[in-house]
């Protein structure tokens, strides 16, 4: 595979690290699927747009839980600048365990998620990226349900201070 051209990201953020971003993307992906399984949407609004959450939750019929998210591959496939934002498209291949109507099943997933952040925002230190906390003050506490930091009150939405999932253009999930 040819590595994605990350010039659009690095031109506005010289501190960008693809491995650290990939860890962050996997953390968001796993947490989002676990919350999908629990039927909990609100906390996801700190890391995902409502459209992305709607797409993620589209197949919740009879779903009781999601667990054991295992990554087979995570690839940054494209980066671009558009409308004052930097976008990174990530392809995930994973399997996870779903419980639907009392039946536990392994599910193979192939998905593309588009992460976005305001152009010019600098990457926080790796430990801040991996905490899903506040990019502003460094608090490792997760945002309140209204998207604000419990330590400093900064808003953690809209890709203004940290990456968010702006869209899920492709999601294919099937039983193994």
Where would I find each of the regions flagged by the language model?
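Generic secondary-structure microfeatures
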Residues: 48-51, 92-96, 119
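A short, surface-exposed beta-strand/turn
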Residues: 101-124
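Short, intrinsically disordered, charge-biased short linear motifs at domain edges
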Residues: 118-125, 133-140
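Core segments of small alpha/beta cavity-forming domains
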Residues: 1-66, 136, 145-146, 150-155, ...
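Surface-exposed, charged secondary-structure patches
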Residues: 63-105
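Short metal-coordination and nucleic-acid-contact micro-motifs, chiefly zinc-binding Cys/His arrays
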Residues: 127-131, 144-145
